[in-house]
Design a protein with these regions (language model features):
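A charge-rich, low-complexity, intrinsically flexible signal that marks solvent-exposed coils, linkers
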Residues: 1-34, 43-69
């Protein structure tokens, strides 16, 4: 999955596949995780958030199925 760099203290890169509703996040500390069944509007809100890290922690982490890849 293609990812883009983001300005965040915790998240380094973010990718999204709308066909499978999968968000992929690479963290600065090295882990890569995928979050499943995430609607495209949530990805859009994440990318437009004033603080990507805060939005991710409040709205995505723990709210969608995830797996380390």
């Amino acid at each position: 999955m293609e990812r883009v760099s983001v300005a965040s203290g915790n998240l380094a890169e973010i990718g999204y596949d709308p066909a499978t509703e999968t968000l992929e996040v690479m963290f600065h500390q090295g882990g890569v995780y995928q979050y499943y069944n995430l609607p495209s509007f949530m990805h859009e809100r994440l990318m437009q958030a004033e603080s990507i890290g805060k939005y991710f922690n409040a709205e995505i982490k723990g709210h969608y199925p995830e797996a380390r890849v």
